[in-house]
Amino acid sequence: MLRGKIFQKGDTLIEVLFAVTVFSLVVVGALSIMNSSTAVAERALETTLVRNQIDAQAEALRYIHDSYIATYPNPVVGQPSAEWSTKIVTNEATGATKFGTCTPPTNAFVVNTGNDKVESRSVITTDVQSYAQLRLNPTVSSEGLWVEAIKSNSSNKYIDFHIRACWYSQGLNTPMTLGTIVRLYEP
């Protein structure tokens, strides 16, 4: 009777361990793919949100410019039209920083989209918590988002506004950067 049980066919310990190992590899592979897909989806969402922040800066610059043009040559103090002549023109540079640089220059600024006021470089930080954005909490702060005003050298009077964003995304060693250029002509 004992002899019959010894020679019965069944799963050996090695076969069971091999099956568990294969199952574990499949599970780890599936989780890795899911994690990678989640990171890609998060980067896509961050890029969309940052693009919205950049578009908001561009629209605020256009609004301030249009206010300035509407009241030219006498901008109204305390109104968006005065921001153009008192803060934007005084922050002009002769050349933009290299794209991909995550350190804003000293003449960088950001437009507070809550009240259309130009905020100085002091509110811009490169310590980004999630994605490049303008925070309108009790105090204004800009995380990885800034504007550079570049005056033209030609007889055409215009200013190119380089709107830049830089932040570190999940799973990447290099920073994500986005930017656009808005050209506005002066009267």
What are these regions (language model features)?
Residues 1-11:
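N-terminal leader/signal peptides at the extreme start of proteins
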Residues 11-56:
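Aliphatic-rich helix starts adjacent to a transmembrane/signal segment
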Residues 58-187:
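Low-complexity, Gly/Pro-rich coil/beta segments used as flexible assembly/activation regions
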